[in-house]
Amino acid sequence: MHLRWLKQELKRTNEELEQIVQESPIWREKAALLRSVPGVGPTLSVTLLAELPELEHLNRKQLAALVGVAPVNRDSGTLRGIRTIWGGRSGVRTVLYMATLCAVRFNSTIKAFYERLRAKGKPKKVALTACMRKLLTILGAMLRNRTPWQPQAAVIS
């Protein structure tokens, strides 16, 4: 009984969020641009619109730092420490992680980038974090330029 109620509430909340996005011409346009990318669905697009309104105004380094997908080094003198990610907007990072898992499977650009990093010997989560950063950079550029997804235009670097 309780699980059914939770599912109904989740469905109702998602429908309300979608209605809010559709009522605003600006958000509707941005959501359509974001959703043109394979692996990006309603959850990520609504999360980015609501929790990261500065997405189209920041450069890639600023975006990565703001979301918390930029590696922070722990070096001291000649000692090379580990690189970790922390801080940033955890809600955006969590949703971006799940979307990147889909993108690695269904988005040819992100998939090729991930496979190249894995072939270089990078651990899976390190490669996935790099893909999160790349996906975020692509989404920011698409909103900034008001262009839909073009797989041939996404340079793999």
Task: Report each predicted region and the residues it spans.
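A detector of single, family-specific signature residues
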Residues: 1-157
